[in-house]
């Protein structure tokens, strides 16, 4: 398994390409589908067979329709069964997907939205909007922040130190770095609710 990062200038966000030994590939959070991303896929002779969405904000998924035209036999996996006007295979916390023989664990990360999830495979955590290097994901109110922080403490900060965190925004990091950087002693207190 190989992981590639593509930075979309128009959204200032990351899309990830996971290349499998079979020649098939997974795209994660395709905010845009431009020539550079197409070149990355084609250069490695990958065929995109699955798209994983960590959230369903339409403004973050502009590349989705184009990808579906280029790679017609693609399935979309997301927490919600409908993304814009496209059908997705719904996934939920604790589920393990089998994508071309590659196990992908689904981790629920509600907070930014109720439909936010992360995907863990091969020591890489694709966490979407839940976490960025050095900061928690953006939320709309203290209750959402408390929910997000509790989920991060229970589901993400318990992963092995060397787990690589690949966020929607910002550079990669690791669980060890974020555990040292971000205070997690009391999610309710951090959210301003205690």
Feature-to-residue mapping (PLM):
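Conserved beta-strand hairpin/beta-sheet module of binuclear metal-dependent hydrolase folds
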Residues: 1-44, 117-128
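Metallo-beta-lactamase
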Residues: 114-194
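Active-site HxH/HxHxD metal-binding segment of metal-dependent hydrolases
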Residues: 12, 25, 32-105, 181-188
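Histidine-centered catalytic micro-motifs
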Residues: 51-61, 107-114, 166-172
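Hydrophobic residues at beta-strand termini and immediately following loops
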Residues: 6, 91, 109
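Hydrophobic residues in well-ordered beta-strands that form the structural core
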Residues: 28, 76-78, 127, 167
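Pocket-forming structural segment of enzyme catalytic cores
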Residues: 95-96, 102-118, 131
